[in-house]
Design a protein with these regions (language model features):
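Extended serine/threonine-enriched, polar tracts that run as long, contiguous segments within proteins
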Residues: 129-153
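Generic alpha-helical propensity signal that fires on short helical segments
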Residues: 66-70, 74, 155-157, 166-168, ...
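Segments surrounding the PLD/"HKD" phosphodiesterase catalytic module and close analogs
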Residues: 147-181
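A surface-exposed partner-binding patch
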Residues: 1-131, 135-138, 202-208
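Structured loops at beta-to-helix junctions and adjacent beta-edge loops in soluble globular domains
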Residues: 63, 77, 140-142, 151-153, ...
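Long, compositionally biased interface segments
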Residues: 169-208
Length: 208
């Protein structure tokens, strides 16, 4: 089964069962935005001096430019470059390389006395600066300011990372079977998790 067929079949299953399974998503939310044209994608890549990871590029051109996904859903490409967590909503610099290859967090966080004080504004601003996520798209808002990142520039290109800086947990690559997850691995694993939750909910309702 090719990835496009697999995704659409899994989405159809989720959409057809989401109401009976009493899950949080509504039927109208289990959908995708219109696809981007090849011309639109090429223009974006040229503007930011990058090439998108092939699986993500195929997704937004053949499945949809954002929509159903982890957290609050997949963000469309033009929204994925904006760091919405910050007051001035700066764009993320995609033509710079993502600076990390392994879990990262500031050392001061582990030793900080959170019950007695709060870090100075300058320290927090440096911690949440977009410089830490240069070369990344924010592809999904997980909640409480935490996001999923797709690296599009640097040695980590094509890998999905979790940005937990909003709750001071740093930057962490998403892993599966001992290796870092690609966009497609990450997204299909999300669909599989939703299907597992639906099946469990349906089984529980039968047994009640």
């Amino acid at each position: 089964m090719n990835w496009k067929k697999e995704i659409l079949e899994k989405l159809a299953f989720i959409k057809s069962h989401v109401k009976s399974a009493s899950l949080g998503a509504k039927e109208q939310e289990v959908s995708y935005n219109p696809c981007l044209s090849e011309e639109d994608i090429a223009t974006f890549e040229h503007k930011h001096c990058i090439t998108l990871p092939e699986d993500y590029r195929s997704f937004i051109s053949e499945i949809g430019n954002g929509g159903f996904g982890p957290g609050h859903g997949l963000l469309p490409l033009d929204k994925a470059i904006v760091d919405f967590k910050l007051r001035d909503k700066p764009n993320i610099s995609l033509n710079e390389k993502f600076p990390y290859s392994d879990n990262w967090n500031e050392e001061w966080i582990a030793s900080f006395d959170w019950e007695e004080e709060y870090p100075e504004t300058e320290i927090v601003d440096a911690y949440i600066s977009t410089a830490h996520i240069a070369g990344c798209l924010q592809i999904s808002h997980f909640g409480h300011g935490c996001t999923f990142l797709l690296v599009v520039n640097g040695d980590e290109k094509g890998h999905v990372w979790f940005d937990g800086r909003a709750d001071y947990s740093g930057l962490i690559p998403k892993m599966t079977d001992g290796h870092k997850m690609s966009f497609m691995e990450w997204y299909i694993s999300y669909l599989d998790m939703e299907i597992e939750n639906i099946n469990k909910s349906l089984t529980d309702s039968i047994n009640d």
